[in-house]
């Protein structure tokens, strides 16, 4: 099935309570598949086409604020419209899930795939000092697997989590093993697992207030410090990455998502030409695997960062490597996906 279809099936199977979205290419199959599957008739999951992306993210705010596992999906221009809501969720510590099946920009741009929303996702695209947990799938299987993972991380840390995919992964078809079916949680289970949620106040506890607003500077600073401490805990415990053919590698290609899939073929071609190169694939774009990449760079002659953008993740790679090895970037723009041999040629330039 398509990556987008896998997202839809995974939403139902992981016990999600609600989906709020708005059609936009190249992710429209997600809400279309949910409409065909009619989960409201089986599990009771709500599926609603909102009037806009702004409405959709605020529906996620409300549903997640009540302790529900709710999700929204969109593509780059639509996710741009959601940034205020995502910032509000981070400030109020509300655990929703957002899926971005990226397309090229800026502006309305193109419907072709891109990875140009990396900065927006990993730096916090709205106002304020906050971070969103960002997972980058590189296969249809990971599209399915990362939905439940995103929910688990979001609720573990009371923080928004994003699956940052792109039009290649969303539209391509692969075999996939769907996750096991989990029942939706009961109201009693939600009350036990989410004591912070706004689900009605029993006499045994004070009122739960969920807001990002605080007008006393010293209190607001304390809240920000607490958020930063939480983000550091996430950095310390939730980094995920994958390495391939690194045992004898002199050079490294760093790539995520669909670019990593292309890089795998580039590495195969390069090794046939006698170039010993391996792949480092960040799975969490935030938190970024900077310590792991720092240690790896100590033993390598050079690093090529392959992206479908003008050079975004390469900045995090350079910060992580910190001058221990040369770092160069190769990317294509405007929705053009790089060919494996183009990456090999960029690698040869790095070697020279």
Report the location of each language-model feature.
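N-terminal glycine-rich anion-binding loops that anchor highly charged ligand groups
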Residues: 1-36
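Glycine-/acidic-rich phosphate or pyrophosphate-binding loops and their flanking alpha/beta elements
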Residues: 2-6, 228-251, 264
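Thiamine diphosphate
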Residues: 29-123, 133-155
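Structural signature of the thiamine diphosphate
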Residues: 132-189, 342-352
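Conformationally flexible catalytic loops at phosphate/diphosphate-handling active centers
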Residues: 158-243
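Redox- and metal-dependent alpha/beta enzyme cores, enriched for Fe-S-associated oxidoreductases
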Residues: 241-276, 280, 286-292
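Peripheral docking tails and interdomain loops at the edges
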Residues: 307-352
């Amino acid at each position: 099935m398509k990556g987008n279809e896998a997202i839809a099936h995974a939403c139902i199977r992981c016990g999600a309570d609600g989906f709020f979205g708005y059609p936009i290419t190249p992710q429209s199959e997600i809400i279309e598949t949910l409409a065909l599957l009619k989960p409201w008739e089986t599990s009771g999951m709500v599926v609603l086409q909102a009037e806009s992306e702004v409405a959709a993210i605020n529906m996620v705010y409300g549903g997640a604020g009540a302790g529900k596992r709710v999700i929204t999906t969109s593509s780059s221009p639509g996710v741009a419209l959601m940034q205020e809501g995502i910032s509000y969720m981070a400030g109020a510590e509300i655990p929703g899930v957002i899926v971005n099946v990226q397309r090229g920009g800026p502006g309305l741009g193109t419907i072709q795939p891109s990875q140009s929303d990396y900065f927006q996702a990993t730096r916090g695209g709205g106002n304020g000092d906050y971070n969103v947990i960002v997972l980058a799938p590189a296969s249809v299987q990971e599209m399915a697997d990362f939905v439940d993972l995103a929910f688990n991380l979001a609720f573990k840390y009371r923080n928004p989590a994003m699956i940052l995919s792109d039009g290649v992964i969303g539209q391509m078809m692969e075999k996939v093993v769907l996750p096991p079916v989990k029942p939706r949680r009961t109201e009693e289970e939600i009350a036990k697992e989410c004591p912070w949620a706004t689900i009605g106040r029993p006499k045994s506890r004070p009122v739960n207030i969920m807001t990002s607003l605080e007008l006393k500077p010293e209190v607001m600073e304390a809240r920000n410090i607490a958020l930063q401490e939480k983000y550091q805990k996430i950095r310390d415990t939730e980094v995920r990455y994958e390495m391939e053919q690194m045992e004898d590698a002199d050079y490294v290609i760093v790539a995520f998502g669909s670019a990593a899939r292309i890089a795998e073929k580039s590495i195969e071609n390069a090794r046939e030409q006698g170039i010993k190169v391996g792949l480092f694939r960040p799975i969490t774009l935030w938190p970024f695997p900077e310590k792991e990449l720092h240690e790896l760079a100590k033993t390598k002659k050079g690093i090529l960062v392959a992206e479908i953008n003008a050079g975004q993740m390469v900045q995090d790679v350079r910060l992580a490597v910190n001058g221990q090895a040369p770092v160069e970037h190769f990317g294509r723009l405007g929705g053009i996906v790089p060919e494996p041999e183009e990456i090999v040629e960029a690698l040869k330039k790095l070697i020279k």
